[in-house]
Amino acid sequence: MALETKPAKDPAAEDKHELDPKRKAALDTALAQVEKSFGKGSAMRLGDQPEQNVEVIPTGSLALDMALGIGGLPKGRIVEIYGPESSGKTTLALHVVANAQKKGGVAAYIDAEHALDPAYARKLGVDTDSLIVSQPDNGEQALEIADMLIRSGALDVIVIDSVAALVPKAEIEGEMGDSHVGLQARLMSQALRKMTGALAQAGTTAIFINQLREKIGVFFGNPETTTGGKALKFYASVRLDIRRIQTLKNGDEAVGNRTRVKVVKNKMAPPFKSAEFDMLYGEGISREGSVIDMAQQVGVVKKSGSWFTYEGDQLGQGREKVRQFLKDNPAITEEIENKVKAEFGLIGSADQFAEDGEAAAAAAVSEAAAADVAKDSKAAAAPAAKTTRAKAGTAKA
């Protein structure tokens, strides 16, 4: 006897069940009371609110922006960056600060480690004159200052460097050998409960830099853990694990690191994606190197042997020469970057950017030609004017 299989019902095709009129009236009354008490938009049907794209701050690495799935770090959310010592945690955070400032945003830096180097920050593009910096005495003071700045509603990004340095006041005032179990974890839990809503309302991105510790007595699984308890793991919308994987050398001299960032947690897009990019000493993240890697990956830039080509034109021989060429030609870099973003569906189509790029190039050529014509006309007019003045002088004499 053959079994009959019924076709699966499509939930989208089924009619929506109408709510009972009495229950609907009661719900509408409740929503009206909530709106009256707490303001418009405090509670609403999700369908009543138009879908909005998440605002982001670029990280400085195109590869990492693509791995995050939305083009950067989300605004109004908590982000945790953790990894071993000298892996590039602070450098990545400073690049985010610099990108926020370039868009006209305001940034703050809570330097709990008292180790911020203004000269290095300037090299990464940070406007140190407008950067708000605080070097607090203890953890409570650091988080209270951060909360007050967030609630001002004027910040775009705030960096707390680092969670491990947020020492509770009781621990500072106590003796060196005293035991203070769970003090920092409770402090973080309380602070994050207060901050989360304020961050969303103000549209401020909070970046917590964290350090790694090892659990004692772990024989199976990963013994590494982060400081500050578990609260940050729950409240963070994005968690980034950053590691050095290779030393970049120019001959025998080390010039930087090849860095891998794994998106361990992501509430905005699928997690567990990885990104690799160059981090150069004194320069930070190599934007051009990341653009080359991603453009090659999606086929916007092609490589044949050691030569790199873009739309049939040779960019150069060898990755380092191409990187320098793109650094000297930011317009081409931006054009390639936009095409890569279009391939990932983050902005308009690649064809549109190609047309825009060609139009911009044509406009640039036209402007240059017009400038040359004007220059030639001016040069030709000068001798004529000189001759006229000479004739006038002779006639006068």
From Swiss-Prot:
Its main location: cytoplasm. GO terms for cellular component: cytosol. GO terms for biological process: DNA recombination; DNA repair; SOS response. It is found in: Cytoplasm. SUPFAM superfamilies: P-loop containing nucleoside triphosphate hydrolases (SSF52540), RecA protein, C-terminal domain (SSF54752). Keywords: ATP-binding, Cytoplasm, DNA damage, DNA recombination, DNA repair, DNA-binding, Nucleotide-binding, SOS response. InterPro entries: AAA+_ATPase (IPR003593), DNA_recomb/repair_RecA (IPR013765), DNA_recomb/repair_RecA_CS (IPR020584), P-loop_NTPase (IPR027417), RecA-like_C (IPR049261), RecA-like_N (IPR049428), RecA_ATP-bd (IPR020588), RecA_C_sf (IPR023400). ATP binds at G83, P84, E85, S86, S87, G88, K89, T90. Pfam families: RecA, RecA_C. Residues 1-23 are annotated as: Disordered. GO terms for molecular function: ATP binding; ATP hydrolysis activity; ATP-dependent DNA damage sensor activity; damaged DNA binding; single-stranded DNA binding. Can catalyze the hydrolysis of ATP in the presence of single-stranded DNA, the ATP-dependent uptake of single-stranded DNA by duplex DNA, and the ATP-dependent hybridization of homologous single-stranded DNAs. It interacts with LexA causing its activation and leading to its autocatalytic cleavage. NCBIfam families: tigrfam_recA. Belongs to the RecA family. This is Protein RecA. It comes from Bifidobacterium longum (strain NCC 2705). The lineage of its organism: Bacteria, Bacillati, Actinomycetota, Actinomycetes, Bifidobacteriales. The gene is recA.
